[in-house]
UniProtKB/Swiss-Prot annotation:
Protein name per its UniProtKB record: Cytochrome c biogenesis ATP-binding export protein CcmA
Protein's UniProt keywords contain Cell inner membrane: yes
Assembly and interaction partners: The complex is composed of two ATP-binding proteins (CcmA) and two transmembrane proteins (CcmB).
Gene field: ccmA
Subcellular locations according to the entry: Cell inner membrane
Organism: Maricaulis maris (strain MCS10)
Subcellular location, principal: membrane
GO cellular component: plasma membrane
């Protein structure tokens, strides 16, 4: 699959280093002594049964959850320890209001990230949803909503993507589009961590089972 992706401002690629991270919920240990180094252009797929802490670990890397122990460092020098300008986050919610169209929603997110509107349609075309640009989100399928959310992530133009079950509601075609989007991001020096229950075909991606870190 060959897609035409838009020209966005150059990324400022950054490394990500996680050292000795431990996380718990109440008295239950979810993750123990987890470490990783992720360089620009790399991707990592985290797997594991429900309850192994995939979402909690992603949220800790994003700075939403304080770990029990360990450290998360982005880049080097003065930007170290700060995720605010480096991370694009995709959680379980797609961030679409039912009465809004993708055009309205994505224009809002583009403005929030100081991006122009021009990349919206090419990114929607790359995800094969350009014909839905003026359809209210309430009339989109879950898979179509997820594709819109992935466009939102790309519009942020951040070097590090943290994706929680990005392919959850996607069909085979959607997963292929997701793989192409991730490949484009990595080709620009971006990196990706994704938590997933599904087998995703991302070339050269690191794979880790969180069940080994409990």
């Amino acid at each position: 699959m060959t897609e035409k992706f838009p020209d966005l401002p150059d990324l400022q690629p950054e490394t990500l280093r996680v050292s000795g991270l431990s996380l718990s919920r109440g008295d239950i240990t979810l993750v123990r002594d987890f470490s990783l180094d992720l360089a620009p252009g790399q991707a990592m797929l985290m797997s594991g049964p429900n309850g192994t802490g995939k979402t909690t670990l992603l949220r800790a890397v994003a700075g939403f959850v304080r770990p029990d122990a360990g450290r998360v460092v982005f880049g080097e020098g003065p930007k170290a320890d700060s995720a605010s300008e480096l991370v694009a986050w995709l959680g379980h919610a797609d961030g679409l209001k039912p009465v809004e169209t993708p055009r309205q929603s994505l224009r809002f997110w583009a403005k929030m990230n100081d991006q122009g509107r021009d990349p919206i349609l090419p990114l929607m075309r790359a995800m094969a949803i350009e014909s839905l640009i003026d359809r209210p989100a309430s009339r989109l399928s879950r898979g179509q909503q997820r594709r819109c959310a992935l466009v939102r992530v790309a519009l942020a133009n951040r070097p590090i993507w943290l994706l929680d079950e990005p392919a959850g509601p996607l069909d085979g075609g959607g997963r292929a589009r997701l793989a192409a989007l991730v490949d484009w991001h990595r080709s620009r020096g971006g990196s990706v961590i994704a938590a997933t229950h599904q087998s995703l075909d991302w070339p050269d991606a690191k794979r880790i089972d969180l069940g080994a870190h409990r």
